[in-house]
Amino acid sequence: MPTMPGSSMRRGYIALVVVLLIAVATLAEQADTAAPAQKLPIWAYPGFPPSGTAASGPKGAEHVPGSTASYTAAQIGDLFVVPDWFPKAHPPMPEVVSHGRKPDVFACGHCHLPNGQGRPENESIAGLPTAYIVQQMADFKNGLRKSSDPGMLSVTNMVLLSKSVTDDEVKAAAGYFSSIKLKPWIRVIEVENVPRTRIAGGMLVLADGGGTEPIGDRVIEVPENLERTELRDPTSGFIAYVPKGSLEKGKLLVTTGGNGTTMQCTMCHGENLQGMGNTPSIAGRSPSQMTRQIIDFQRGARNGSLAPLMKGVVTKLTIEDIVAITGYLASQKP
């Protein structure tokens, strides 16, 4: 029988998965103990503050640099409206991305932005494989993807949305965001002391009183320009402060596995960490978001089809390891 197109590629991918499963099993056997469970880091799971402590929202008709568009505060806060400041910078949005479907399918582009760049409280989904996005929606729907923090509103919203969105809407949104290349979005800076922060709108922002404090074992990710971030400007990115020396340590863990601490990320995610097949790219994405995913795999909150691979890989990682890995990944070209 003649070989069908793509059969050799599929066999190669299956063989790779088998090899990785064996490697992960070996890694798990070598682990004396898993990394001890720790309290969830609030910098990665900031949630939403009590009423009255959120950042002050925009007032009246608003604009962002370089755009002729104008939106009101009510429009900017409406989950069924996507402030499209630069409509020529991306393909035409499917209806589910631009407006959603009332009453319970929010516009995808509102939270993830029209270009899929996302924000620390949700996820950058630009450039992810279509099949991967579709699978994640199925995992949300089937209870296989949750958050280790039940108060993580972005995940709660995704779970609720997944139960109402249609298969066609999921495919349309997945195809749209997959077609857009992720752009550099995060500036990573190594520091010993970091600006003091507060929680606003599900993310960290600079504290009103200023000042600094030791960074410790944290990644502090804040908007480059809070006002533009609140206006959902898809061209205004973020700064990620990481501890001194963490990028070199992260590179070692990512590229070599750190002498048995984990496995090389490049084995599954590609030599340049920009994905391979239906395995997602992990370069240049939010370190806050990536930290949550590693912890969620560790704690069993993520249980999709390839979760067994990731669980074995992240079992021994400490919070210091995770900070180093996610900081290094964020510093790489998407």
Enumerate the predicted regions with their spans.
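Extended intrinsically disordered, low-complexity coil regions enriched in Ser, Thr, Gly, Ala
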Residues: 126-155, 186, 283-295, 299-307
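Flexible coil segments in periplasmic/lumen-exposed cytochrome c-class electron-transfer proteins
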Residues: 31-106, 145-264, 299-334
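Bacterial N-terminal signal peptides
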Residues: 15-25
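Short cysteine/histidine-rich zinc-coordinating motifs and their immediately flanking basic loops
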Residues: 119-125, 277-283
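Detector for the c-type heme attachment site
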Residues: 110-117, 141-142, 178-179, 268-274, ...
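N-terminal secretory signal peptides that target proteins for export/translocation
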Residues: 1-11
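Bacterial Sec-dependent signal peptides at the C-terminal "C-region" and cleavage site
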Residues: 24-32
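Intrinsically disordered, low-complexity segments enriched in Gly and acidic/Ser/Thr residues
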Residues: 257, 264, 270-279, 286-292, ...
